[in-house]
Design a protein with these regions (language model features):
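Conserved SAM-binding loop
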Residues: 1-2, 13-114
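Intrinsically disordered, low-complexity, compositionally biased regions/tails
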Residues: 5, 29, 197-199
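Short, structured coil/loop segments at alpha-helix boundaries
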Residues: 11-13, 58, 191-195
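S-adenosyl-L-methionine-dependent methyltransferase catalytic module, highlighting the catalytic core
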Residues: 78-204
Length: 204
C-alpha cells in the first residue's frame, strides 16, 4: 500500500482545516481516500465516543490502523498521569509498520515566544519524542516545527510493549499554568481535540 506524504507547504496550507466550517476532519480524510474513524467524547461529526484515558475501551482496535493522527488532542488530556494511557492507546491501535503523526504545541516555543499560550495544560519537546521513539522501537521519520507546532511522524516497526516506565514518561511532558478566562473556554478547548484514526481503504 502507498503512504501519501505532504510537503511543508501542503501542511501549512491545511494547518487550519479543522477550523474550516465547510469541512470536518472526517470529510477531509474521506475525500482523500481514507477509511476514517475519529474519537471524541462529544460524538460530533460522526466521531466514536470513547475515553482516551481508558485503554480497555480500545482493545478491539489493537493493531487495526495504518495511520493514526494526534492533532490537537493529547495536550488536553488530564490529569497529566493520563497522558501515559492516551499514548499507550495510540501505540496499541497502530499496526506494525503503521505511522503515528503528532502535531502538538511545542514547549520551547511556548516558553521563549508565547506560542500556544493558555491553549492547553501540556506541551511537548523534541527530546520527548526522541526518548519515546527509542523506548518503543519506533522509527523517527520526522521531528520538526511547523507553524509553532511540534510535528512528528513515527513508524511502529516492532511489536513491543509500550514504554513501561510510566513515571519516566510523565516527567518528559511539560506542564504549564493556564490563565483561562472562564470555565466555558477551558471545557470547550478540551472537547475540541479529536484523535483521528485512519485506515487506507485498500489496506484492510
Amino acid at each position: 500500500g502507498a503512504i501519501h506524504y505532504l510537503t511543508k507547504e501542503e501542511i501549512n496550507n491545511h494547518t487550519n482545516y479543522l477550523e474550516n466550517r465547510l469541512q470536518t476532519g472526517k470529510e477531509y480524510f474521506s475525500n482523500r481516500g481514507y477509511d476514517h474513524i475519529s474519537v471524541d467524547q462529544n460524538g460530533l461529526h460522526g466521531s466514536v465516543i470513547r475515553n482516551l484515558t481508558m485503554p480497555k475501551q480500545f482493545t478491539d482496535w489493537h493493531y487495526s490502523f495504518d495511520i493514526i493522527t494526534n492533532m490537537g488532542t493529547t495536550e488536553h488530556i488530564e490529569p497529566i498521569e493520563s497522558q501515559y494511557e492516551c499514548f499507550s492507546i495510540l501505540h496499541d491501535c497502530t499496526k506494525v509498520g503503521g505511522i503515528m503523526i503528532h502535531l502538538l504545541p511545542d514547549v520551547r516555543l511556548h516558553d521563549e515566544h508565547g506560542a500556544w499560550k493558555n491553549h492547553c495544560p501540556f506541551y511537548y519537546s523534541k527530546s520527548f519524542f526522541e526518548i519515546l521513539a527509542k523506548d518503543c522501537k519506533y522509527e523517527l521519520l520526522s521531528n520538526t516545527i511547523i507553524n509553532g507546532l511540534r510535528c512528528v511522524a513515527l513508524r511502529k516497526i516492532k511489536d513491543v510493549t509500550f514504554m513501561q516506565d510510566k513515571s519516566k514518561f510523565v516527567l518528559l511532558i511539560a506542564q504549564r499554568n493556564q490563565e483561562w478566562s472562564s470555565g466555558f473556554v477551558r471545557n470547550f478547548l478540551r472537547r475540541k481535540g479529536v484523535g483521528h484514526f485512519l485506515r487506507r481503504l485498500n489496506l484492510r
